[in-house]
């Protein structure tokens, strides 16, 4: 609720039915009309799901072979959202491919509940010196003076540059009204490490302190 405050333009109804649905979208006109998005697709998209109104539960599966959003081409997109007692359990896999930006393969699992998104993201950037790893994090959302405030907590994670493994140490990054605050962002490899702290918001009084050891 902190992330999306806008009220729905469609009337809400409450029932007690259970039903399943399958939807094939040969184009994205309906999707863009509902979501106010500029999505295009060269292949048909398929949506399947089960709704249990009495329990307020939803199981949703999306298969989009090739979609483009704001110039970003996403291929082999698979999205699953399932209602569980602890929140919405989500899995997603996709391949970003195109002339703009790097080729990236991604697999992610997440839990959405109580203004918080907990996620574990595995990624791979192919090439002669591949980059791959996983990022485990928890993003929380709130409202401060009416504006969205985002806090990202990074849990221990790994990023591999070819044969070099970097450890991502626990750290916090927060953002509110163009103010980005970095609290002890650290990458380490045995005795080598890079540590960053500060506030890079563009104000002339802001600063970032970066410390290097054996780099």
Where are the predicted features?
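Interface amphipathic segments
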Residues: 1-215
């Amino acid at each position: 609720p902190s992330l999306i405050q806008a009220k729905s333009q469609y009337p809400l109804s409450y029932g007690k039915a259970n039903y399943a649905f399958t939807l094939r979208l040969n184009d994205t006109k309906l999707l863009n009309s509902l979501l106010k998005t500029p999505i295009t697709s060269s292949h048909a998209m398929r949506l399947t799901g089960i709704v249990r109104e009495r329990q307020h539960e939803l199981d949703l599966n999306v298969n989009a072979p090739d979609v483009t959003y704001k110039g970003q081409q996403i291929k082999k997109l698979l999205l699953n959202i399932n209602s569980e007692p602890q929140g919405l359990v989500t899995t997603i896999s996709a391949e970003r491919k195109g002339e703009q930006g790097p080729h990236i393969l991604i697999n992610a699992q997440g839990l959405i509940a109580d203004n918080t998104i907990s996620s574990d993201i595995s990624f791979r950037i192919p090439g002669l010196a591949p980059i791959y790893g996983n990022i485990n994090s928890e993003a929380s959302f709130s409202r401060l003076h009416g504006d969205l405030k985002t806090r990202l907590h990074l849990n221990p994670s790994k990023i591999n540059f070819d044969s070099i493994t970097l450890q991502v140490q626990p750290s916090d990054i927060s953002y509110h009204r163009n103010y980005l605050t970095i609290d002890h962002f650290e990458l380490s490899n045995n005795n080598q490490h890079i540590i960053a702290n500060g506030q890079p918001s563009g104000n002339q009084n802001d600063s970032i302190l970066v410390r290097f050891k054996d780099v």
